[in-house]
Structure formats: C-alpha cells, structure tokens
C-alpha cells in the first residue's frame, strides 16, 4: 500500500525583516531545519523499502488555523493579512532547491 505524507509542517516564530536591498524577508531557519529533518527521514524510509510515494508540506501560505486562528504561521510563504501581500520565506527557497535537485 503506497504511503503519502499529506500534512507536515511547523509553526515557527516568523519575523518579517528588511534586507540590505530593501526587500522584505522571513528567515525561518527553524522551519527549514524541521523540513530538512523530515525529508531526510522520508528518504531513509524510501531507501529501506517503505512505499512512500508523496510528501506535502503544510502549508504553502500562512492561513487561518482552526486551533490557533491567525496567531500561528505554518506557511512557506508569508501573508500580510491586511494587504494580502505575499513574501516567500527562506523555507520556500529551501524547498525550491530541494525539488530542483531531486534525482541528482
């Protein structure tokens, strides 16, 4: 029976900062480490013969969580709830690079 990880993510303290170029950034190193650790375990499971066929990160974008409302941010894309502006977090770039390198 194939296995799919359908919701894996972490609410971390995301602090919106302005970098030297004036761009808004979120340096979410805790989330990156969390995702890296879980992806490493997924790879290990596959190498050991587990039929893991898919992995879905929770969540693409910050959203309303039933248990926490808007107080916790799980997304790899920061959402300014007042303006709806979206800013990719460092974890989004991390996952982009992981996906781009898949199979290497």
Language-model features, listed with the residues they occupy:
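Non-catalytic scaffold segments within catalytic domains of secreted glycoside hydrolases
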Residues: 1-104
